[in-house]
Each structure stands twice: as C-alpha cells, then as structure tokens.
C-alpha cells in the first residue's frame, strides 16, 4: 500500500496531521499532490504544547513539514480492498503488451534492437576475399 494512494482515497474524509514542529491539524482532506502537499478544510490547529487552538476554514500544508498522518481505519480498509481486486499498484495482472517496440520477445538472445547479435553480421570490418593479399600486386 503506497502512501499517495492512501491519501487519494482519503479525500473528503477527516484526518489528523502532525508537523515536525509539533503542531497538529485536524480537518477534512480536500486534495493532495505527488509531493504530499495537502489542502485541508474545516481545520482546527493545536499548538505544540496543546494549550492553544485555532479554527481555520482552510489550510495548506507543505509535504516536507509533515511528521505523520492519522487516517480513519475505514480508509485503510478501502485501499486494501482495491489492492486485492488488482486495481492498485502491483496487484495480480494479466500479461499484456505494454509500450512500444518490436512486439516479440523482450530482452533475450539476439532478439532485441540493442548492441550485440550474431557476430560478423554488422557493419564491422569487411570480409577478406580469397586470392588477393593486402599490399602485394
């Protein structure tokens, strides 16, 4: 289970975010990006000591400042179910051709497009012809 897939599933659900400086933010996840920057709505911020509280309509948190996230168990269960169905990353997949290329066997002996192959079949030295020697006429 990948953290970003977990966050994508957790959109519009409540969560708690603790920052590296000790502050905590409780709110509903609006969106997140690949760097784990997140937007929350209906946020309650708690100071490091736990003695001060602020209510904010919305909040943006940079991903690199996050220490941990607390997400409801039902979200984690939803992600596990999706992964079991094969929709998540790395689940059971059917063999299918992907991307570009020659379509046949992938890497292997002399089947690809790279270097190597049958010796002497490339653009190397020309073959010596019998009967003539270089330098004598």
Curated annotation (Swiss-Prot):
One Gene Ontology CC term in the entry: U4/U6 x U5 tri-snRNP complex
Primary location group: nucleus
Region called Disordered, residue ranges: 82-137
Keywords: Acetylation, mRNA processing, mRNA splicing, Nucleus, Ribonucleoprotein, RNA-binding, Spliceosome
Gene3D superfamilies, alphabetized: 2.30.30.100
Database matches in SUPFAM superfamilies: Sm-like ribonucleoproteins (SSF50182)
Annotated localization: Nucleus
Entry-linked InterPro entries: Lsm4, LSm4/Sm_D1/D3, LSM_dom_sf, Sm, Sm_dom_euk/arc
Subunit structure: Component of the precatalytic spliceosome (spliceosome B complex). Component of the U4/U6-U5 tri-snRNP complex, a building block of the precatalytic spliceosome (spliceosome B complex). The U4/U6-U5 tri-snRNP complex is composed of the U4, U6 and U5 snRNAs and at least PRPF3, PRPF4, PRPF6, PRPF8, PRPF31, SNRNP200, TXNL4A, SNRNP40, SNRPB, SNRPD1, SNRPD2, SNRPD3, SNRPE, SNRPF, SNRPG, DDX23, CD2BP2, PPIH, SNU13, EFTUD2, SART1 and USP39, plus LSM2, LSM3, LSM4, LSM5, LSM6, LSM7 and LSM8.
Protein name as annotated: U6 snRNA-associated Sm-like protein LSm4
Species lineage: Eukaryota, Metazoa, Chordata, Craniata, Vertebrata
């Amino acid at each position: 289970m990948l953290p970003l897939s977990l966050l994508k599933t957790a959109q519009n659900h409540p969560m708690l975010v603790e920052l590296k400086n000790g502050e905590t933010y409780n709110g509903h996840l609006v969106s997140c990006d690949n760097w784990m920057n997140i937007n929350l709505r209906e946020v309650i911020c708690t100071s490091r000591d736990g003695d001060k509280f602020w209510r904010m309509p919305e909040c943006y948190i940079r991903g690199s400042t996050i220490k941990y996230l607390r997400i409801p168990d039902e979200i984690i269960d939803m992600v596990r179910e999706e992964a079991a169905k094969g929709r998540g990353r790395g689940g059971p997949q059917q063999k299918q051709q992907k991307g570009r290329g020659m379509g046949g066997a992938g890497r292997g002996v002399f089947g690809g497009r790279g270097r190597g192959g049958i010796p002497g079949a490339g653009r190397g030295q020309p073959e010596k012809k019998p009967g003539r020697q270089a330098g004598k006429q």
